[in-house]
From Swiss-Prot:
It comes from the Eukaryota. The modification N6-acetyllysine is found at K895. This is Lysine-specific demethylase 3A. GO terms for molecular function: chromatin DNA binding; histone H3K9 demethylase activity; histone H3K9me/H3K9me2 demethylase activity; iron ion binding; nuclear androgen receptor binding; transcription coregulator activity; zinc ion binding.
């Protein structure tokens, strides 16, 4: 399964081989080696266990081998390039080869087989190679011409499903391959894993060890071996190492291996590069050496792990001068307000980097050397006799050693931990004292804490998971399984040092109360309960340990353990108490009313915390995402209502730099969830509900598997305790404030809770109820559509100015008009809303209640749907600064003959009709790039229209008016392009020569765009050498390959590796209000520094061009969609030199890609450099595209597994024929965009898109979260839950619920502060 590049070779250890020696022939003469009878040659086969060095080209290469049919005790070292050796073949890759069907001998089938490639060939094999079919042990020799590469896993489905032996062997190959990819990289994901290392001692073949550290720099592993204590460092490229999977179990239809899910910045970072997604996660054969996310190995006894350290605070950058704000709606920003900054991070935590571990190349007694040393048969040291038995096998983990570089506990200790005075209520500046002051009234005093009722996990006393009142031996506990992920301190990519070598300087170190003799004595005497303020590892051994600390206890270095209490699942959560005998025991857990000012202040709309937001922006944000926030509140209330009254809800306070995630589906936990009181296993509301429903119905729970608890006990839903993260009732109180603020500011609310009543969605309303609500003037809402429930309707007005107008004062319909803008005119007069109340147009949409995730509603179906994005602005519009479109609107309305309103489908129709009606003759004559006259569209912004007037292209990236124009199209879910950015950038920074000079020696993985094969062992310099020079490109079968860099720079390293380029990009990227990390309309910027900030880039995408006619069916990046918005900048276009007629081929590709005439003129007449051909589709058409691809798959005989998706798998590129079929059969037409040098393509969240490079391109993408497209982020997060564990999109890294909450919280704080400054009630 190893795909290699050119003549380079992979690591040899662990591979099967074939050897042919002249000494084994009949007479040793050359004539006896008849190629016609190659199968009869005296081949010897076996397995390579160790090598003298990794350079296979050196003639002194020696390998330690075990021959088949011989005892391992007869292993020996052989010289590969011996004079008597005629050939030496090694396992190479997985292919398809023709053979007779095992079932029907007359039938010829394509069968998966492993090929061998010659390392030495003196026998003249030439094109003949050895092949072993999966499921058979016998080898055959075939011509290479008869072998076909495996392009898609679907080509294997027949052989895998029909033959269980083949299926099992294929799965074993995948597991072996994934293990090797981690081992050979020194991956920190292996920390805690049990491995077996090949022994050269004659008394034993293997010995066991535990991985305690990984070093990606030297690609070695640090291990702990009780048999040979001197063994510390292992190089898997020199000696055979295997990961032990001793907890392989089957859940449903999928096998999962006991391993720990840990996120690694060295391995894909905290957010996997979107470019890497072009390789189908569904096809292991297509990605043979891809570092698949470690969630492939979902643990059984071990869970997910702790987090990556926190990244640098992006707000340290100066905020750019804001462009034009959203429409001024009659309010001003109060002077002298909201200038306080958020609580600052500890500077040392932000700026400290881990020092690389300097591993000495000492030779241990085991005879294992680092790569700097060479192993020979003469100087090989034999293993010593094992002095002890192997340690008890531990559950295998696929774990990153993040504990070595984690921040100290930065979270303030709960006030109840220490007998200190309660904080003054005046310390918090509350935006709404009457409604929020009650939180502080419930702040606990020290006496309250000691007498507080304990949370006994909400289970019966005889429950097997109940830990209260009895001791649990540490050995009986499950190992570490934490999904508290991704701390916010950035770790050096080369870091592999232990915690003792990576101190965080000047960080506040709060000692546990148990380390203070005076406080300890007082607690022992009083028996007062206190909160656990240290990790389980550092507490007495008799207490049950959480899943995280159980694994941490395997670490022998106590210095590494004590600095990481924040990753303990019971840290600041579990309550402890000394009994009358002075023995420490578990007393319970914190309750929601036991918070302090620090804890509650994180979740309240405090004006002192509002930074980087103005009044107009606050109103705009609340208008767009307020309904989604209300839907979140309703969902929380609904989940809370299902909890039995007798069960006490626990409170787990947010821990700084740690992200709570569901142990089952990897979704970020927002608030309510369920926790095991014994091991800390936690599940989200959705997984808990699904599990409980299936248990009640007796159905098999096949979608997700649940990790097991102590002693492999099953986690039963009734034994988990409900737990919330937001303290007190802050969530519901902020929800009340949102309604109050929206009513006072006239912000329209379409949320289901706007009637101030909570209704369950499970019971649809009766027809009589619908009729009554219709008569009352209520209208269907977007929130109801999202939940597919027609019973929740909104009253006509909600307080404030909106409530001042009686229902009977509606204006009659205006005379009919044929103007295409008449429907938009109603946005200011309110006619659209009145018409919606009369027609009830959303009921047909609600019929689709079977699907969990309804497709996005078409823009043409209802103006109610448009209302959320286009007109969810404030009701009172009193001036002319509300947007250029509103200035153009006529007051007349138009109706068709049947009396229904004639509403244009999309905003493009408006502009198109204007241009066609008034400037038809001018448009046909105007030259390329000429702007439309300002007098026509009412604004002076350089721009033009592409894709037949459906794509807005802004020409001045720094124009302050771009803001208004961009937003009007962006609301409609349309992509937008901005040109000319390359004139602003420092071109010297983005040339291939600069990258080659700075990073040419770095080792990277490459992807062959034609086959999606991953190539290892190359350097960055190898890629850049062929960027503009085709003859210098890496070759496959003597043909230059079309390559792209995979995940480079890796993870979040762009800013650290390329600070000058990062600054250059951020200073010149268009529309900084959206695209910058601190942009006021980038909702991700609203997430406090207390939380783990999502990695939104920048990411680099570097790839060669696909020029030939045959390449038009391939994509540089296949069709996929992303959970966030993105701005993709073309910073460099490299045209290969010496290629004839390539310009003509590029033109044909552009024409074949359905580009419009103006785009072609840019290439021919404007002499601009085309970089990439994009095809982008509207998010609302996603479901149609999905159905179309499934249909095509079925036509081609491919399967559609339930846990895979044709779009998320990124296994399709829509060529011309498929695009034509999609348009004819489903009516889906996208945007064909050619991205020239300096163009920035804005892709909306949830919009399917694909990319085909025309020339060699360097692109940089920055992701952001805009208010207009939050709903797509919300839906996609739910979709990704159901993807298989191998998907890079499976894990929720955007934290969309947290982003929505804190964006609304800050907007409310700003509006409340502004309201009080104007003296409003």
């Amino acid at each position: 399964m190893v795909l290699t590049l050119g003549e380079s070779w992979p690591v040899l250890v662990g591979r099967r081989f074939l050897s042919l020696s002249a000494a084994d022939g009949s007479d040793g003469s050359h004539d006896s080696w008849d190629v016609e009878r190659v199968a009869e040659w005296p081949w010897l086969s076996g397995t390579i266990r160790a090598v003298s060095h990794t350079d296979v080209t050196k003639k002194d290469l020696k390998v330690c081998v075990e021959f088949d049919g011989e005892s391992w005790r007869k292993r020996r070292w052989i010289e590969v390039y011996s004079l008597l050796r005629r050939a030496f073949l090694v396992e190479h890759n997985l292919v398809l080869a023709e053979r007779k069907s095992p079932e029907i001998s007359e039938r010829i089938v394509q069968w998966p087989a492993i090929t061998y490639k010659p390392l030495l060939d003196k026998a003249g094999l030439g094109s003949i190679t050895s092949v072993r079919f999966l499921g058979d042990q016998q080898r055959v020799f075939l011509s290479k011409d008869l072998l076909k590469p495996i392009q898609d896993v679907n080509s294997l489905r027949l052989s895998l499903t029909d033959n269980q032996i083949v299926s099992k062997e294929f799965q074993a190959l995948i597991v072996k391959h994934l293990d090797e990819s981690h081992l050979l990289k020194g991956d920190k994901n292996l920390v805690g894993s049990e491995v077996k290392i090949y022994s050269l001692d004659p008394s034993t073949q293997w010995f066991s060890a535990t991985v305690i550290n990984g070093n990606p720099a030297s690609k070695t592993l640090q291990v702990n071996c009780e048999e040979i204590p001197a063994l510390k460092i292992v190089d898997p490229s020199l000696i055979h190492v295997e990961v032990v999977h001793d907890n392989l179990v089957t859940c449903g239809n999928s096998a999962r291996i006991g391993a720990v899910k840990r996120k690694s910045s060295e391995n894909n970072g905290t957010l996997v590069s979107k470019q890497a997604k072009s390789c189908s996660e569904a096809s292991p054969s297509m990605c043979p050496v891809q570092s698949v996310p470690t969630t492939v190995f979902k643990e059984i006894l071990l869970g997910c792990t702790a987090a990556t350290p926190p990244s640098k605070d992006p707000r340290q950058q100066s905020t750019p001068q804001a462009a034009n704000s959203p429409p001024n709606l009659g309010a001003k920003i109060p002077q002298g307000c909201h200038k306080q900054s958020l609580p600052e991070e500890i500077s040392s935590c932000l700026n400290t980097k881990s020092e690389a571990l300097r591993t000495k190349p000492d030779v241990c007694k085991a005879g294992l050397l680092s790569k700097s040393s060479q192993i020979g048969t003469g100087d090989l040291k034999i293993l010593t006799e094992p002095k002890g038995s192997c340690t008890q096998p531990k559950t295998n983990t696929d774990q990153e050693n993040r504990l070595e570089s984690v921040p100290q506990a930065l979270t303030g200790l709960p006030k109840e931990c220490l007998p200190t005075k309660a904080s003054s209520k005046a310390e918090l500046e509350i935006a709404n004292p009457p409604e929020l002051q009650k939180h502080l009234e419930h702040a606990p005093s020290p006496s309250d804490v000691s007498n507080a009722p304990e949370v006994k996990a909400g289970v019966n006393s005889d429950s097997p998971n109940n830990c209260s009142g009895k001791k649990v031996e540490p050995s009986a506990l499950a190992c570490r399984s934490q999904n508290l992920k991704e701390s916010s301190v950035k770790v050096d990519n080369e870091s592999c040092c232990s915690r003792s070598n990576n101190k965080i300087q000047n960080a506040p170190s709060r000692k546990s109360v148990l380390t203070d003799p005076a406080k300890l004595k007082k607690l022992q005497q009083s028996g007062e309960a206190f909160v656990q303020d240290d990790s389980c590892v550092n507490i007495v051994a008799q207490l049950p340990k959480c899943r995280e600390c159980r694994l941490d206890s395997l670490r022998k270095d106590k210095e590494q353990q004590k600095d990481s209490p924040v990753f303990c699942r019971f840290f600041h959560f579990r309550r402890l108490q000394f009994n009358k005998h002075g023995v420490l025991r578990v007393e319970g857990f914190l309750t929601p009313n036991k918070y302090d000012n620090e804890a509650i202040g994180l979740w309240l709309p405090l004006t002192k915390n509002v930074v980087g937001i103005d009044l107009d922006t606050a109103k705009y944000i609340l208008a767009n995402i307020g309904d989604h926030f209300c839907q979140m509140v309703i969902s929380e209330k609904e989940a809370m209502s299902t909890i039995e009254p007798h069960r006490q809800v626990a409170w787990k306070r947010a821990v700084k730099g740690v992200r709570e995630m569901c142990d089952v589906c990897d979704t970020t936990i927002f608030n309510l969830h369920w926790v095991c009181p014994r091991c800390g296993f936690g599940v989200c509301v959705d997984c808990y509900r699904m599990k409980r429903k299936n248990c009640q119905q007796g159905a098999a729970y096949k979608t997700f598997s649940w990790l097991k608890c102590v002693k492999s006990q099953i986690h039963e839903p009734e034994n988990l305790m409900p737990t919330q993260i937001i303290p007190g009732k802050a969530l519901y109180d902020v929800g009340d404030i949102v309604h109050s603020v929206r009513a006072k500011w006239g912000i329209k609310a379409n949320c289901p809770c706007s009637n101030r009543q909570f209704k369950l969605f499970s019971k649809p309303a009766s027809k009589e109820d619908l009729k009554q609500t219709s008569l009352a003037g209520e209208k269907p809402t977007l929130g109801a559509v999202l939940q597919q429930n027609p019973s929740v309707l909104e009253p006509a007005a909600v307080g404030g100015e909106a409530a001042s107008k009686p229902a009977g004062s509606m204006k009659p319909a205006c005379p009919a008009s044929t103007s295409p803008l008449n429907w938009l005119a109603d946005l200011t007069s309110g006619n659209v809303n009145k018409e919606n109340k009369e027609k009830q147009p959303t009921m047909p949409i609600l019929k689709n209640e079977i699907k969990c995730l309804p497709p996005l509603p078409p823009l043409s179906k209802s103006s109610t749907v448009l209302h959320t994005f286009n007109s969810t602005i404030l009701t009172p519009v009193s001036n002319n600064n509300s947007g250029f479109l509103r200035n153009l609107l006529n007051s007349s309305t138009g109706k068709t003959e049947n009396g229904l309103k004639n509403t244009p489908k999309i905003l493009d129709d408006i502009f198109a009709s204007l241009v066609q009606n008034k400037t038809t003759s001018d448009l046909s004559k105007r030259p390329q790039g000429l702007t439309i006259k300002p007098s026509i569209l009412g604004f002076d912004t350089p721009h033009y229209w592409l894709c037949d007037n459906r794509l807005l292209c802004l020409q001045d990236p720094n124009n302050k008016s771009n803001w208004n124009v961009f937003r009007e199209c962006w609301k409609q879910g349309q992509p937008v392009m901005v040109s000319g950015v390359h004139h602003k950038l420092n071109s010297e920074l983005w040339k291939p020569e600069s990258f080659r000079k700075e990073f040419g020696e770095q080792e990277v993985d490459l992807v062959n765009c034609r086959t999606n094969e991953i190539i290892t062992g190359a350097t960055v310099g190898d890629f850049w050498d062929g960027f503009e020079d085709v003859p210098n490109r890496l070759k496959n079968e003597k043909e230059p390959m079309v390559l792209k860099l995979k995940d480079w720079p890796p993870g979040e390293d762009f800013r650290d590796m390329m600070p000058s380029r990062f600054d250059d990009l951020m200073a010149n990227i268009p529309l900084p209000e959206y695209t910058r990390r601190d942009g006021k309309l980038n909702l991700a910027s609203r997430l406090p520094n207390y939380f783990v900030r999502p990695d939104l880039g920048p990411k680099m995408y570097n790839a060669y061009g696909l020029i030939t006619p045959e390449d038009r069916k391939y994509g540089t990046t296949n069709l996929h969609l992303d959970v966030s918005d993105a701005a993709n900048v073309m910073v460099y276009v490299g045209i290969p030199k010496g290629q004839c007629e390539q310009e003509e081929e590029v033109l044909k590709t552009i024409q074949d890609g359905d580009s419009d005439e103006l785009t072609i003129k840019r290439f021919i007449e404007g002499k601009e450099k085309p970089g990439a051909l994009w095809h982008i589709y509207a998010a609302k058409d996603t479901e149609k595209i999905r159905e179309f691809l499934k249909k095509v798959s079925e036509e081609q005989g491919q399967e559609n597994p339930a846990d895979h998706d044709p779009i998320h798998d990124q296994s399709w590129y829509l060529d011309r024929s498929l695009r034509k079929r999609l348009h004819q059969e489903y009516g889906v037409q996208g945007w064909a965009i050619v991205q020239f040098l300096g163009d920035v393509v804005f892709i909306p969240a949830g919009a399917p898109h694909q990319v085909h490079n025309l020339y060699s391109c360097i692109k940089v993408a920055e992701d952001f979260v805009s208010p207009e497209h939050v709903k797509h982020c919300f839906w996609l997060t739910q979709e990704f839950r159901y993807l298989s564990q191998t998907h890079t999109n499976h894990e929720d890294k955007l934290q969309v619920k947290n982003v929505i909450y804190h964006a609304v919280k800050d907007a409310v704080a700003m509006l409340k502060a502004s309201e009080s400054s104007f003296g409003k009630p």
